[in-house]
Amino acid sequence: MGHFSSMFNGIARSFSIKKAKNINSSKSYAKEATDEMAREAKKKELILRSSGCINADGSNNLASVFSRRGEKGVNQDCAIVWEGYGCQEDMIFCGIFDGHGPWGHFVSKQVRNSMPISLLCNWKETLSQTTIAEPDKELQRFAIWKYSFLKTCEAVDLELEHHRKIDSFNSGTTALTIVRQGDVIYIANVGDSRAVLATVSDEGSLVAVQLTVDFKPNLPQEEERIIGCNGRVFCLQDEPGVHRVWQPVDESPGLAMSRAFGDYCIKDYGLVSVPEVTQRHISIRDQFIILATDGVWDVISNQEAIDIVSSTAERAKAAKRLVQQAVRAWNRKRRGIAMDDISAVCLFFHSSSSSPSL
């Protein structure tokens, strides 16, 4: 861990020094290049921003996406899948975003639209300024992605704060994003959406592995940070068990997550947009990954979710079936409580013929 830390700090330091020498021209060129990549990908139908399915020719990746509006007004969830991310055949970007507050649907869409391009720009810039040595290749690649995700989230949040047409003072969004590059998945999580992997156990059964932490305010490290910034964490009397973040004096905003983009009314009191960045090596046993908003996980367990997806006859309809099952579970388990927006992305790693039989 110490070795990785020093490597990560070295990459950050080295890149900052080199970047400072020619910051304006390099940044402008990188932005233009990534914008052009996004336009080309959209033309070739390699970017999906609505419910549906994407499976590019020659790719083992198949992504299924579905989102359903809840009972609280406009759907504030949104998602994106970008196959051939950055013009790399072995890369795919997936993200799911859960907005909240009066402007939440605008905030989630803004972050969804800006994050993939910003990340690609930061990754390419960092990569071009870094020499990858063979003995530490994997560690260095992770360090580069981690640095790129951190810089991206910082930039996206700052851009959102100064956006002229979106009021994100009392509104925000979570963001759960992954990049698959070859046989490695890089995961960045801001908020309480969740990534769950379906993998085949030694006994041959399909089991769920949770890859992310639900960043709730009552997690010890999150609560400590919030209280250290003079914020408060407590449950309302009519919501026992639902911990929320509050300002020092006012009874607002009452966020049910401890990390989010936007929500500047509480940013000085412990809410952060810093992602937790992790990686996972994909093996032949790993079948698919589910990214879903808390509307799914509030009523469906990790194991139930992978069982639903794996038993869906058509992979292209896997996300839709998962969401439909979550709706049924919500009506059964939370009768009388307004249903949340419910959204999911299911990314399958292998063609059905190459998957091990259970």
Curated annotation (Swiss-Prot):
Keywords: Hydrolase, Magnesium, Manganese, Metal-binding, Protein phosphatase. This is Probable protein phosphatase 2C 34. Binds 2 magnesium or manganese ions per subunit. Mn(2+) 2 binds at D98, D294, D340. GO terms for biological process: negative regulation of growth; protein dephosphorylation; regulation of microtubule binding; response to water deprivation. Its cofactor is Mg(2+); Mn(2+). It comes from the Eukaryota. It holds the Pfam family PP2C. The keyword Hydrolase applies. Its EC number is 3.1.3.16.
